[in-house]
Design a protein with these regions (language model features):
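Short catalytic/ligand-binding loop motif for oxyanion handling, primarily in non-cytosolic enzymes
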Residues: 48-51, 69-72, 127-130, 150-155, ...
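Glycine-rich phosphate-binding loop used to anchor ATP phosphates in small-molecule kinases
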Residues: 104-130
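Short beta-strand segments
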Residues: 39-41, 119-122, 144-146, 235-238, ...
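Short, conserved active-site loop motifs that form the nucleotide-linked donor/cofactor pocket
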Residues: 60, 140, 232-233
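Conserved phosphate-donor/acceptor-positioning beta-strand/loop module used by diverse small-molecule
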Residues: 122, 133-159, 252
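Acidic-histidine catalytic/liganding microenvironments
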Residues: 57, 137, 230
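PAPS-dependent sulfotransferases, especially Golgi type II membrane carbohydrate sulfotransferases
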Residues: 1-37, 165-175, 179-309
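PAPS-dependent sulfotransferase catalytic core
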Residues: 1-106, 113, 162-166, 171-173, ...
Length: 309
């Protein structure tokens, strides 16, 4: 029954989004449009818990992984092929921008948030679409959460291998990699085209290695845009979030320029559990990926290390 309900939910949300994206909606130029905040990071890095906490702030309107809205803005964003079988793009930049997608983005994302000062959108893989997002919202800010790469790759491995999330009519749907593993097809294609270890991708044969590659490409895109974004980018580690949540939330509020509520922070910190020790977990990667992976681990003071294949 659940897999049928999911099919109905995804189809209905997408059709409503497409309807709202059309020009017959209210004139957006007479409305107050919010500058968005994008919460990004490789999946399984803590964006969900951070998004949930920030969503409870009275000044913040929150959109949780609105794939249906993005697919209505531009079908090429449908990297899981949730709504149609399409040759979607994972890495997206300003070349994907169009005036039509700008208008659809404004209608679906920026309009209609009554009594809110901030729009927070959380789709982790948007870390690989910063150029596209910047074209749509040149004043947008970004919050990036980064977590130990081995922890991330193991979490992706568990999710992709267990694959318990089913959708009716999509027998070849994988919870992490999408229909017929299309997300991996796009990641390996777009990652290679962007120069991310093109000669080593074919050596990745399991979900943990592929998850580590997604982590590497995500961090590579963050580094590529770091200087350009400047003070529009705020970065935290998963360990900072779990080890000192109160200070982390205060700093984020200052970055977002929203009020700091002691009651909200006290309530929020109770929902964040300390990170579990994962020292000793292993990961094997091709030599080039392995070297870059361990450099990032050192950069963020993560203890685990990959070893070369």
């Amino acid at each position: 029954m659940r897999h049928w309900l999911r099919l109905i939910k995804y189809s209905l949300l997408h059709e409503i989004a497409k309807y709202k994206a059309e020009p017959w909606m209210p004139n957006i130029f007479t409305q107050k449009l919010l500058s968005p905040i994008f919460l990004i990071g490789c999946g399984r890095s803590g964006t969900t818990i951070m998004g949930k906490i920030l969503s409870e702030h009275p000044n913040i309107s929150y959109l949780f992984e609105p794939y249906h809205l993005w697919a209505a803005v531009d079908p090429r964003t449908d990297i899981l092929n949730l709504y149609s079988i399409i040759d979607a793009d994972l890495l997206m930049n300003e070349s994907h921008y169009s005036w039509e997608s700008q208008m659809r983005f404004n209608r679906l994302f920026l309009y209609g948030h009554k009594n809110k000062n901030i729009l927070l959108e959380k789709t982790p893989l948007n870390a690989m679409r910063i150029g596209y997002l910047n074209a749509l919202a040149p004043e947008a800010k970004f919050i990036h959460i980064v977590r130990d790469g081995i922890d991330v790759s193991l979490s992706i491995d568990r999710l992709a291998s267990t694959n318990s999330y089913k959708i009716a009519g999509k027998p070849q749907f994988n919870q992490w990699w999408g229909v017929q593993n299309y997300k991996w097809t796009a990641l390996s294609r777009d990652g290679a085209a962007a120069g991310y270890y093109p000669d080593e991708i074919n050596q990745l044969q399991d979900n943990q290695g592929k998850g580590a590659y997604e982590w590497l490409v995500t961090l590579g895109e963050i580094e590529r845009w770091r200087e350009f974004l400047g003070n529009r980018l705020y970065e935290i580690t998963y360990n900072q979030m779990t080890g000192n949540p109160a200070e982390t939330l205060r700093n984020i509020c200052q970055f977002l320029q929203v009020d700091i509520s002691s009651n909200w922070i006290e309530k929020a910190t109770k929902t964040i559990l300390p990170a579990r020790s994962t020292l000793g977990n292993t990961l094997q990667l091709p030599s080039g990926m392995c070297a870059s992976f361990n450099l990032h681990q050192t950069q963020f003071n993560f203890p685990n290390r990959a070893i070369p294949l």
